[in-house]
Amino acid sequence: MAANQRYRKPLPGTDLEYYDARAACEDIQAGSYDKLPYTSRILAENLVNRADKVDLPTLQSWLSQLIEGKQEIDFPWYPARVVCHDILGQTALVDLAGLRDAIAEKGGDPAKVNPVVQTQLIVDHSLAVECGGYDPDAFRKNREIEDRRNEDRFHFINWTKTAFENVDVIPAGNGIMHQINLEKMSPVVQVKNGVAFPDTCVGTDSHTPHVDALGVISVGVGGLEAETVMLGRASMMRLPDIVGVELTGKRQAGITATDIVLALTEFLRKERVVGAFVEFFGEGARSLSIGDRATISNMTPEFGATAAMFAIDAQTIDYLKLTGRDDAQVKLVETYAKTAGLWADDLTTAVYPRVLKFDLSSVTRNMAGPSNPHARFATVDLTAKGLAKPYEEPSDGLMPDGAVIIAAITSCTNTSNPRNVVAAALLARNANRFGLKRKPWVKTSFAPGSKVAEIYLKEAGLLSEMEKLGFGIVAFACTTCNGMSGALDPKIQQEIIDRDLYATAVLSGNRNFDGRIHPYAKQAFLASPPLVVAYAVAGSIRFDIENDVLGVSDDGKEIRLKDIWPTDEEIDAVVAEYVKPQQFRDVYVPMFDTGKAQKAPSPLYDWRPMSTYIRRPPYWEGALAGERSLTGMRPLAILPDNITTDHISPSNAILAASAAGEYLAKMGLPEEDFNSYATHRGDHLTAQRATFANPKLFNEMVKNEDGSVRQGSLARVEPEGETMRMWEAIETYMNRKQPLIIIAGADYGQGSSRDWAAKGVRLAGVEAIAAEGFERIHRTNLIGMGVLPLQFKPGTNRHTLQLDGTETYDVVGERKPRGDLTLVIHRKNGETVEVPVTCRLDTAEEVLVYEAGGVLQRFAQDFLEGNAA
């Protein structure tokens, strides 16, 4: 008998069964289940549920890791769903289409390559805000441009839903994946073959933890790891660090969920919760709506964690009802949660290895920036921080210093929270009543993550107020938050260039890394939706938003922020009256009623040879199919701390003078249709030219005459010592077949779950990366591409080793999970230094993937050997 059958029991009050993880844990140690944190209880159920092919001792060895809080052995995790946006989701499916070709060429059956786990792809990353919210026809124009630019991509995506099994596609113009996941796709409790079990999910975006707010373990992964899960493989893991965060107190009047999450992000970054599963509990957590919780969970990657969990409680049930879920499903969620010990009241006995406390009443009105989401500051401190200065608007009609050139209400972080959206709309209404206007140089936009926002704002009579101030709906997509802010007015852009202006962006997004939002917005600031509206009126980051005068009313009254900020009571009254279950049903029932798609005539995609968007991937051929020597490697770059995936493989608009822009011009694309780096990631010939193409990069191998590090997408080719553009350096090394290494500081690879940040360096010939530390998703992606992550021991770094880029490097030793290896450094003067480093292949499975050359090579081997899942 399978190890788990003894724990399969009837679910009370239903005709379903469930796996009793409590009983399985109690069989090992009495009273153990009550002490488990929420995360461990979900993981325990997943282990018991999927233990149909292992014996009881094996199952108990896995459960013992949870009970004893140990991190000694790997255990499998099988997520129930994979959610994708069109960039990484498309890239993953391009890989699977390429895998089909590779299998067919070796005599295998390509039709067997299919996702076996439910895979949901939402097209939300492709739309650029070319027309701002002051254009009444902006939505139509932006969608038409999106369709024209992305015809190749959308052709492929439409093919996938007919060619692959278990793939659902939500086409462009319908919303953001995380918000749709929250409002519709996640059932919280799944049912399969008569068994109820917790919904779990991985997504090809670092903000996938958005639905952790519902009590669903939902984590961001790279496209390569998503492919592993799609194909039914276990995601091998060790028990993560689990940190309890007790939320106390009650927020002050006028404080939004955005203010709370920016304060929490600063707090949790300082507390170093990197890679941890954070669990919120306490009276403060209970008081937060699901909208507020989702705003917090969404920014999980910004505070460095893997997940940000809230247990299921009455707020969860109320939200499921509000969003139009079926009554039977809502009842099942409550029944299952209370039976399985997942109801918040059952978590009072949970024991956390580490507990932090955060007082909600301490939160003031906040912003974050520039450059980092955890760089929080209170708006009352703008002057003290040196941002706000005595402000006088230029009388000559020119832009002021610190001009806000983009003000965007964007991102599922905030638009999935009706309270934040309504607050912005009410502030816009109040501003209109006093005759306030947006400044003419501010490109304003409103891009909700759900069509429901449009309905409740219309019914409340508030959408017209937003439109009057320039915040008409430009899209239901990610837009500015993922760098798709679109072109500026040419006159405004030229003025920025001619006057070398310090121009900025203010957005309600979740990231503000340098260069991400727009090439001409030197810095960006995160703020709540109502503050975004206020800054559109103010027009400059130098404006003291709390104290300076926004305008003068008809009767001569000076209008400040406090005069237009809506009360909590007014916000709550609008939400209570105008946000209704039927609105969600009206949006989502037709969206998901896709009918029966006709099956594609061939399992193989007919690649378009001139496409710059979709191209057969090269991962099973040429140099990538060969051995990695890990000897004689030269450094492509020596990099500082906090290198993000935006530095490694940017997402924003492709400029004509860039390597990718020059390539696209040669391929015959007009400059206005270059689109973004992100949209071209299905074509490796375009995408690899994005590698380290961020103009904000600091490669410490490239110096100015005064010895300071020179900024730009630059590299120094050795042994000649010649400085050139990064892409030319990569081409030079590729032609020489020169193996490469990257040396970096702490927190390498933070930010978006961007598999091209790993693919790009591997295609360049990088075989290893030695850093002081890695962000979780990027480290996994590197392994998935066959790049070896190495971590310096504490106290050792590029500075202590006095590295200058003239060295060559070898890696010596047997690769074992977190074992010691030796980085052998050969200096130019003939000296050799041996440096112990940690092999950051953290699990036995990761070692196997690396040795195979990466996950794609591993898949091909398994399918050809008949070991496919």
Predicted regions and their residues:
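N-terminal amphipathic, basic-rich helices that act as targeting or association modules
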Residues: 1-144, 288-298, 302-326, 609-649, ...
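Terminal amphipathic helices with adjacent charged low-complexity linkers/tails
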Residues: 78, 97-152, 280-388, 546-606, ...
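Conserved phosphate/anionic-ligand binding catalytic regions in large, soluble enzymes, centered on
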Residues: 87-96, 198-225, 289-312, 371-373, ...
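Extracellular/luminal Protease-associated
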Residues: 281-288, 510, 731-775
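Acidic, glycine-rich flexible loop/linker segments
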Residues: 553-570, 574, 778-849, 864
